[in-house]
Amino acid sequence: MLGGFPQTSRIDLQGSSNFLTKLRRGKAQTTRESLPPLERVADCGAGIGRITKGLLLGVANKVDVVEPVKKFTDELVQSLGNGEYAGDGEGNRGKGQVGNVINLGLQDWIPEAGAYDIIWNQWCVGHLTDAQLVVYLQRCKDGLKKTTEGQETSKSCIVVKENLSTDPKHKDLYDDEDSSVTRSDVNFRRLFQEAGLKIVATELQKGMPKELFPVRIYALRSA
């Protein structure tokens, strides 16, 4: 998904970090004080852990990874530093740890109810049909922590960050080689609505090479 451009991963992770910080601070909060760590998040379609290691371990105490390919998660776990994998039984001095390693496809994963501050989905939902995506998002919605009244920065959400179709008529683009779909912004919004979700923040990723599809990030909560 990074298109062979080595600088793209850094640009992507920085954009995601900035988006998440703005989302957690909320419109009314301009303080530069550091935010408390999130308790538990999920990295879905985690692969070898680029987002887990490059972003989520820095903002959360526990990161569960959901990835169907076991050799990818084995590589992820082997690449972690001392104390970064809860399965080793070591603490990590207040820093984030990888918690559960779940080798399932998104369509088969049922999140623990009310467990997660953030469920992060990036470059993975294109392998789900529209119907599967709606059901999956509904399950993710049930997996979010319930918000405590008045705790604006602790509001949980689903994050979806994906390539967008560039079709002038907003049609989805299908790739027969890997059986994936690149959806239009219009279709994403329709599917989010079908799943009972509202968009609370969204922006285009800046700085990506023009040769690649545009990338948009959405933060979603129950409508």
Regions found by a protein language model. Give the residues of each.
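Class I (Rossmann-like) S-adenosyl-L-methionine-dependent methyltransferase catalytic domain
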Residues: 1-114, 128-141, 148-223
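A conserved beta-strand element that flanks and buttresses the S-adenosyl-L-methionine
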Residues: 120
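Hydrophobic adenine-recognition pocket in adenosine-nucleotide-binding enzymes
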Residues: 124
